[in-house]
Amino acid sequence: MEEVESARNEDADEERSNEVKNSRRKRMPLFGKKKFDEKITKKYVFHEVLGTVDHPNIIRLWEIFDNKTHLYLVMDLVKGGELFDRIVEKGNYTEKDASDLIRQILSAVDYLHDKGIVHRDLKPENLLYYSPDEDSKIMISDFGLSKTEDDDSMMATACGTPGYVAPEVLRQKPYGKAVDCWALGVICYILLCGYPPFYDESDANLFAQIMRGEYEFDSPYWDDISESAQHFITCLLQVDPKKRYNCKQALDHPWISGGAARERDIHASVSEQMKKNFYKAKWKQAFNATAAMNRLKNLKLGADSARASESNNNAKKI
């Protein structure tokens, strides 16, 4: 009897799998169970994060089902491509377009934050257009690093993607929702000039720039960008998370809600810089910030030791 019931369940799984595969409305990532702890995945991804989310700018998880070998996540099917790819392909692109994009993303992140969810890995590769239509909405995807935040708790696990990670994460301090707002500041900066505010081939130098909040609005790339846009970015890229704008403050900024964004075409400059700067693998890879910071500590300890040794040698010579 158990074998018959098992066979029926497997047939149902196969039927459901084929049904979803043939659906135009949904996509279905599948994962081998050896790579996933099924119970944790269902509890964490479905119930604690994606299972509670319903927003027009967030890819929705509709259901989870499994068979003996695989776990299936039934999600929205988005076919419009990645954010930067679409911008590069456009014939016209303005500051107002960037403002509209950021407004949609802010609305979604504000919704997540109100539900106690921190994305923790906001970056252009996780921002997808819903359809190829010119007026398609933007969607937030990839909640692999997302975490729910209790009212009285702060997170401490260092994670993210190097160029978008907030200073408090690199300092290995407890952090909260403000890390998403920092990442949005980085994304907004890139949308308006085509290159990142913080960059260096050396991780140590990159992290040092971020922790100091060291960036510029360089000429000529920012000459045609409004002061309102620059002020908006400055409000998000505050090193002190207590001084950083939250989503609601950002949504109320004149550049987002007050019509301050310019409508001059900046496509040529922005798309050229995007093509130059964003085919670099290191900007597309998530990283373990704890391991990275440990490497930096070792480098610092080594440098301090070398300086101490040099100082001792000089003292002996004297």
Explain the meaning of each model-derived region.
Residues 5-19, 231, 248-314:
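C-terminal regulatory tails of eukaryotic serine/threonine kinases
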